Amino acid sequence: MKTTAFLLTMLVPAVVSAQQKPTTGYAPVNGLKMYYEVHGSGEPVVLLHGAFMTITNNWTGWIGELSKTRKVIAVELQGHGRTADIDRDISSANLADDVAALLDHLKVPRADVIGYSMGGGVAMQCAIRHPDKVRKVVVISSMLRRDGSVKEALDALQHLTAETFKGSPLETEYKKLSPTPNEFPNFVKHLLAAAAKPDDLGADKLKATKAPMFFIHGDADGVRLDHIAEMFRLKGGEIFGDMRPRSESRLAILPQTTHVTLMQRMNVIVPMVNDFLDAKPQKQ
C-alpha cells in the first residue's frame, strides 16, 4: 500500500553528525510534562517536529549543525516521544501555547522558531499568539490551513487508521520512548482526529505578524504551489525588489524534493536557515 510505504519513509534519518550530550528535562506546561533538550550555546532557536515524529527522527544531524553557533531547544510536543498525551485537542493553538510556556520555564524571553510539517503550523501560531516571544520563524513544508495540501495528500489522510501504523517504525519508536507505550492506537486516533479538523491559522493573522518568516518547500512536497505563494505574499513577498526594499521574509522551493526528502537536504537548507537567522534588518 502506497500510503503505508510513505509513512515508513518518514523515519528515514537525516545525516548524522556528532553531538555533545544535551541538557534534558521535563517542563510542567498546561497539564503536560513536556520533554525538551538543550544543545549548544548562543542565540536560542526552538525546533518543532512533524506529526508522529520525535526529536531524534526529525532533527538528527540538524541539531549538530545548528548548535555549533546557537542554543538549540528541541521539544517533543503533546503525545509525541517522551511527552505523554493528555485529554485535550492537539491543535496548533494549544501546541503553540505549550511552546510559549516552555520558554517561560527555561527563562528564555525570545527565540527563533523552526518547524517542520505540523511543527511549521505550530511555529506560525507561536508568531501569531505570542509575538513578543518570537524573533524569526522558519516554516518547512507546512500550510496556513488544511486546504493548502494537494488533493492527493488530503485523500490519503482520509484513509489512515491506527491499523495502518501497526508494526511500523513509528509504532516502534513510540513504544520505545513514550511513558505510555501501550497507548499508541489511541494516540494515532487522537492525532488523526486533530488532522481532520480545518485548523485555519487565518490569513489576516499571519499577515499581521511582525516576525520575518522563511518558507521552505520541495517542489513535490504535497503543498499547493498557489498556497505557498499566498503565504509568502502575506509576508510581503511578490514585489520587484530592485525598485524598493525587499521583504524580510524569504521563500525557497527545492527542486526534485518531497515532503519527506526535504529533511534529508540538510546540507542545502541549514546554510540558508543560518543566513536568514543571522541577517540584519535592511536599511529602508
Feature-to-residue mapping (PLM):
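Flexible "cap/lid" loop of the alpha/beta hydrolase fold
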Residues: 121-129, 135-172
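Short beta-strand/loop motif that positions the catalytic acidic residue
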Residues: 209, 215-217
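Conserved alpha/beta-hydrolase "acid-adjacent" motif
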Residues: 222-230, 262
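Active-site loop/oxyanion-hole signature of alpha/beta-hydrolase fold enzymes
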Residues: 67, 74-114, 254
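Active-site nucleophile elbow and catalytic-triad environment of alpha/beta-hydrolase enzymes
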Residues: 189-205
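Alpha/beta-hydrolase fold catalytic core
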Residues: 2-46, 69-70, 278-284
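Catalytic active-site module of serine/aspartate enzymes centered on a nucleophile-bearing elbow/loop
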Residues: 242, 247-284
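Conserved HGGG/HGGXW glycine-rich cap/lid loop of the alpha/beta-hydrolase fold
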Residues: 32-84
